[in-house]
């Protein structure tokens, strides 16, 4: 299946920004602790924990650090008293946006999220307002590789789809609970992915122009700056021409 590099570029940009802010490890550790507390410390029996471990390893977190986080969760660490909250809304240009948070204070979190929307010309919506536009999937990414080899191994392991982008990058899509199993099968076949994460994939896209694209990027930046925000998903699509002006 052919694709475009826009989505890969957006994801890589996001990862670079998180790393620059020094927040990504803090957010991953919080997810590891929470996942272990809610579902136990065995990743084979806890898909959420397995997904968090895959994300930690993709971001070069050491095994020692992630194991300590899991132990904190299993041990009932006070810091694990977090709840997952999903907010939905509309951004510039009618972009559908989903925000995944981990918080111990709903009032604080919703105030920060609402502030970001109000500053950037968006609107915080009600539950279900945009969720129907997204599907939860596992995404295993290769910056480069042989499409036929990866596709054959991935589909044999139970992947749902394989997308090749214009820049040579390849994404393998799976049911989110099966991502760890598929990644293990790919590695057993000698195919080591550059990253693996659970994501919300939009079914439709909203084209961003030179006016709306900067506003959308500002909104995403503000949301990602919130300590309680774990992930921001959107269906905005920015062309290479517009991206070059940002």
UniProtKB/Swiss-Prot annotation:
Similarity comment: Belongs to the TACO1 family.
Keywords: Cytoplasm, DNA-binding, Transcription, Transcription regulation
MF annotations from Gene Ontology: DNA binding
Alphabetized HAMAP family for the sequence: Transcrip_reg_TACO1
Presence of keyword Oxidoreductase: no
Region of interest (Disordered), ranges: 1-20
Name under which the protein is recorded: Probable transcriptional regulatory protein YebC
NCBIfam families on file: PRK00110.1, PRK12378.1, YebC/PmpR family DNA-binding transcriptional regulator
Cellular component terms (Gene Ontology): cytosol
Localization per Swiss-Prot or TrEMBL: Cytoplasm
Major place of residence: cytoplasm
GO biological process, one term: regulation of DNA-templated transcription
